[in-house]
A protein has these predicted regions:
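Transmembrane alpha-helical segments
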Residues: 8-20, 31-34, 46, 50-57, 144-148, 199-204, 217-249, ...
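Hydrophobic/aromatic-rich transmembrane helices and adjacent perimembrane loops
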Residues: 2-5, 38, 47, 161-170, ...
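Membrane-interface transmembrane helices that cradle and orient dolichyl/undecaprenyl
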Residues: 12-28, 38, 62, 151-152
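Transmembrane-lumen/periplasm boundary regions of multi-pass, lipid-linked membrane glycan transferases
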Residues: 37, 48-155, 168-179, 230-237
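Short periplasmic/luminal acceptor-recognition loop of GT-C membrane glycosyltransferases, typified by
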Residues: 251, 255, 261-298, 311-318
Length: 335
């Protein structure tokens, strides 16, 4: 969903800025549609309201509060999002399971965000390991910082600055997910690309503007060239590294288990895939069914799904699942 989220987010920001400048109902409809779809794809994208607010203040000052079209836009996009997430939370509780309310500010901020924000490991994991190392692959990270420094006083970049700030706020509000799932930092790549592109395309102009001459100019020019050359080289290394056999070893048991089920089970059999809660086992089994977290796997939950039609229980986490659950399955079912 991250690709869809980025697409709708960028489209929302673009059409909103176009509507602010030239208005028009077709722009209004497109910006409202894209905003709603962005919020529905990933709830924290609501933080992108910050650059939208900046544009409103730029054009209307405080009189934006009297613009009924802005209120209509906010009401439609946020109300539809609220109704959907409220419904999805209700769906989770139908079978009696406990659901963490995805609309709960208290759940996100007071139970996780504040705690994580006070830990140095959070900043190292998110901003260095994920953003600087994986998302921007070192060279891009350096150019990103340079781009920010050189655009701090440029008003035409203020919109992008607020966009970046909104994403940083989102990192803290959704700190639990950002730390756990590496792909949650992907949204920063879009505004970062603007700053990186500015730093690269204006390197010579920037050197002239700041009156850098002599050996310093040569060193800085060489630095920019090295950064640009390193980007594709590091990218190639990162991508090919993910396909090395040693890195893929952890997925082999899941693939093997899935293949066995695919060859054994009937086409319409339903499967319980028990690893860490992800869908990989169902994917390799080529069957529909349910996912289950091996850390909280229980006899009660398994039996509940069996009554709903589950035919197979598949796992590669025998060392993680409670031994009493394994003993129960071996005693009562064919293994």
């Amino acid at each position: 969903p991250e690709s869809a989220m980025l697409f709708f987010s960028v489209a929302m920001l673009y059409f909103f800025s176009e509507w602010i400048d030239r208005e028009g109902w077709w722009r209004f409809v497109l910006m409202t549609l894209c905003a709603t779809l962005a919020f529905l794809t990933k709830l924290p994208t609501i933080c992108l309201g910050l650059p939208l607010l900046y544009l409103c203040l730029q054009k209307y000052k405080l009189y934006f509060l009297t613009q009924w079209k802005l209120w209509f836009f906010a009401t439609i996009s946020i109300l539809l999002t609220f109704l959907w997430y409220n419904h999805s939370n209700y769906i989770k509780t139908i079978d009696g399971s406990i659901s963490n309310n995805t609309l709960s500010f208290r759940y996100y901020v007071f139970e996780y965000s504040i705690y994580l924000a006070l830990k140095l490991s959070f900043y190292k994991k998110v901003f260095f390991s994920e953003v600087f190392e994986k998302d921007l692959i070192y060279a891009g990270g350096v150019l990103f910082i340079i781009g920010i420094i050189f655009t701090l006083k440029k008003k035409e970049f203020r919109y992008i600055h607020y966009w970046l700030l909104a994403i940083l706020i989102y990192f803290f509000l959704a700190a639990k997910e950002v730390v756990w799932h590496t792909y949650y930092t992907i949204p920063i790549i879009v505004p970062a690309s603007v700053f990186i592109g500015y730093a690269i395309s204006n390197s010579l102009k920037l050197l002239t503007a700041y009156k850098v001459t002599g050996i310093k100019k040569i060193i800085l020019q060489a630095f920019f060239i090295v950064m640009v050359v390193l980007l594709p080289l590091i990218s190639y290394h990162k991508i090919t590294g993910r396909y090395k056999a040693k890195r893929l070893e952890k997925d082999y048991p899941v693939q093997i288990a899935g293949k066995i089920v695919d060859e054994t089970a009937r086409e319409n059999d339903l499967v319980i895939g028990c690893i860490w809660g992800g869908p990989e086992l169902l994917y390799y089994c080529n069957r529909r069914g349910w996912t289950m977290d091996s850390n909280i796997c229980s006899v009660e939950r398994i039996e509940s799904l069996r009554r709903e039609g589950a035919d197979y229980f598949v796992t590669t986490k025998l060392d993680v699942i409670d031994s009493s659950v394994i003993d129960y399955l071996k005693k009562n079912y064919e293994t």
